[in-house]
């Protein structure tokens, strides 16, 4: 018996509408995030509000709230993009001898790629850290994974990966906050982060 079942046109139209709606939602979200970055580049974290974001992106305040119910959620979304960029293409676990250097190089490249914005995100996340609700813009979990994977003799300070990673992240945060506050240029920040990754004299780098 021949199969007479045909695809329901109304079902296909529904799928197409759902896809368009999903694409439009993603596009609007990205528009809002890029508009938020523009505000941060031109001003400070205190300039980023639902009103300013709506004005910059050309959407209503209600639309802004639909995607981001408060300013904190905007900062968290922007911070997630930074952390995801650090994670991207990072092969873990890795037994390569240069895994730590590769990670440090990748992290530096991400942070200075849009330093005017990311400096503001670091300050915002530091201000909200006490509440426990803002995601900190530092890759501590990634660093621990990298240090755990490398050979014991290559771990700075201690063979214990937790101790080694904790020491490096302490140095890294010092460099990060100094850079975010404007005490370090991008080049000086890179030098200090490489110091954190090797725990050596920065003048020897």
Model-derived segments and their meaning:
Residues 57-68:
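Short hydrophobic/aromatic patch on the recognition helix
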Residues 40, 72-82, 125, 135, ...:
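Alpha-helical DNA-contacting segments of helix-turn-helix folds
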Residues 1-56, 73-76:
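Basic, helix-initiating cap at the start of DNA-binding domains
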């Amino acid at each position: 018996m021949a199969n007479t079942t045909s695809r329901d046109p109304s079902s296909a139209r529904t799928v197409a509408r759902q896809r368009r709606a999903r694409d439009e939602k993603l596009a609007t979200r990205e528009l809002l995030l890029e508009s938020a970055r523009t505000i941060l580049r031109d001003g400070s974290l205190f300039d980023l509000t639902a009103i300013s974001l709506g004005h910059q992106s050309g959407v209503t305040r209600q639309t802004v709230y639909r995607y981001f119910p408060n300013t904190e959620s905007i900062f968290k979304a922007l911070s997630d993009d930074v952390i995801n960029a650090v994670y991207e293409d990072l092969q873990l676990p890795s037994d390569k001898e240069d895994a730590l250097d590769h990670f440090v190089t990748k992290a530096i490249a991400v942070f200075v790629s849009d330093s005017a914005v990311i400096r503001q995100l670091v300050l915002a996340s530091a201000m909200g850290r006490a509440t426990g609700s803002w995601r900190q813009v530092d890759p501590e979990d990634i660093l621990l994974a990298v240090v755990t994977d490398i050979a014991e003799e290559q771990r700075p300070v201690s063979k214990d990966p937790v101790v080694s990673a904790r020491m490096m992240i302490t140095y890294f945060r010092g460099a990060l906050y100094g850079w975010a506050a404007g005490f370090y240029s991008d080049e000086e920040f890179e030098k200090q982060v490489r110091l954190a990754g090797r725990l050596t004299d920065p003048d020897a780098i």
